[in-house]
Structure formats: structure tokens, C-alpha cells
């Protein structure tokens, strides 16, 4: 099968979700690293008119939007399946993928993880404690709900790793690097155990920010 090319800034949790899915399927991929500040410029705008990431190229097929990419990968290479066969479990997977996009990232990860992890590492940002404090109520709601939906299951949509885990784990992995993680997960040992379980998978271990940054250096 033709290799996948992933256009992204190293460290993107959205791109990591794609990498995780490809690793789970044992599909070959290569990194086409983007520089910070290049998303709203050509040639990237010719791939993604909204200037976001990641963008995947597979032969002559170009695709953006992480959820669309993940579902394409799962349909293209159905073994092992990353979508539950049970309709309710599949619906729960879809629900959690959207929670990840609209609530875990928007207003939580893109604030706390940026202020604590990404901003200092990439841009030399000094964390703004007031900005972080303002988003903590939403963060608590998001963590409470994801932990509730996880319950005592091994993974987010049941007993098997799914696209929901591929999406949520990279976001949570950033959050786990912040001091807010301890308080946000204090009442949710199931969430802590789930992240440890997912991070132990070879697909997550092979796609850490540091490893992808090394790939970017080699690709430059």
C-alpha cells in the first residue's frame, strides 16, 4: 500500500491521533514537517484552505480534518478494527471524538496545555495563571464527563482500543504534563489508569512529541 504523508507541526495532538491509527494498522507513513507560522501561508493553504493541521496525502488523495482521516484509515485497512461493531459502542466512540474536538481541546487543552507545555517549549511563552484559572471550571466538567463515560471499561468505547482512544489520548497526554492534572483527575483514578494503559501501547510510544521532533529533523 502507498505510504501516507502527514503534513503537520511536530507535537500536534491531532496529527498524533492520525499517527497512532496508522501505527495500530501497521501502515507506513512519513512526516512532512511544517514550521510554526506556516499554516496560513502557501503552499500549506493549497492543501488546507482553512490553514489547520494535519493534512494527509495518500497517493493522489489529499484529506484534512482529523476525524475524516481516522475514519478513512479504518475503512481502508479494516484489521484490526478501530470502530466497534456494536452500534451503541460506535455511537459512544463518535460522541467522545466530538467531545475531544469541541470541549477537551477547545477551551481546555488549547489553553492549559498551550500555556503550560506547548507555548513555553515552542514560543518561550510564560504561563498566564489568570487565563489558566478561568478555564478550570470547563476543564473539570470535561474531565468529569469523560471519566463518567469511561466508567470501568478498559477503553473509551468498550474493551477494545478505538478511534476515540486515538483522539483523546494525545490530548490527555498533554494535560498530564501540567500541574492541573492532579486536581482534575483526583476523583477519577479510572482516567489515570486509562491514560497509562493507552500510553503503554506501541502506537502511542512510537509517536511522542520527542520522537516526532527527531523525525522532523531528519526530514528537514
Give short role names for the model-derived ranges.
Residues 1-133, 147, 154:
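GST-like domain detector, emphasizing the conserved glutathione-binding G-site
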Amino acid at each position: 500500500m502507498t505510504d501516507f504523508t502527514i503534513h503537520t507541526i511536530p507535537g500536534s495532538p491531532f496529527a498524533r491521533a492520525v499517527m497512532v491509527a496508522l501505527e495500530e494498522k501497521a501502515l507506513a507513513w512519513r512526516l512532512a514537517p511544517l514550521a510554526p507560522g506556516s499554516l496560513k501561508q502557501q503552499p500549506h493553504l493549497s492543501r488546507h484552505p482553512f490553514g489547520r493541521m494535519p493534512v494527509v496525502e495518500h497517493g493522489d488523495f489529499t484529506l484534512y480534518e482529523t476525524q475524516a482521516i481516522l475514519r478513512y484509515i479504518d475503512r481502508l485497512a479494516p484489521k484490526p478494527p478501530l470502530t466497534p461493531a456494536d452500534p451503541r459502542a460506535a455511537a459512544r466512540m463518535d460522541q467522545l471524538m466530538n467531545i475531544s474536538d469541541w470541549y477537551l481541546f477547545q477551551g481546555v487543552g488549547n489553553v492549559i496545555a498551550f500555556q503550560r507545555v506547548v507555548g513555553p517549549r515552542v514560543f518561550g511563552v510564560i504561563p498566564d495563571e489568570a487565563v489558566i484559572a478561568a478555564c478550570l471550571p470547563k476543564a473539570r466538567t470535561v474531565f468529569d464527563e469523560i471519566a463518567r463515560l469511561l466508567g470501568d471499561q478498559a477503553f473509551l468505547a468498550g474493551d477494545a482500543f478505538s478511534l476515540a482512544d486515538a483522539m483523546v489520548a494525545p490530548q490527555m497526554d498533554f494535560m498530564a504534563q501540567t500541574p492541573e492534572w492532579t486536581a482534575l483527575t483526583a476523583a477519577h483514578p479510572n482516567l489515570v489508569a486509562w491514560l497509562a494503559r493507552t500510553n503503554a501501547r506501541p502506537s502511542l510510544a512510537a509517536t511522542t512529541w520527542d520522537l516526532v521532533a527527531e523525525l522532523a529533523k531528519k526530514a528537514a
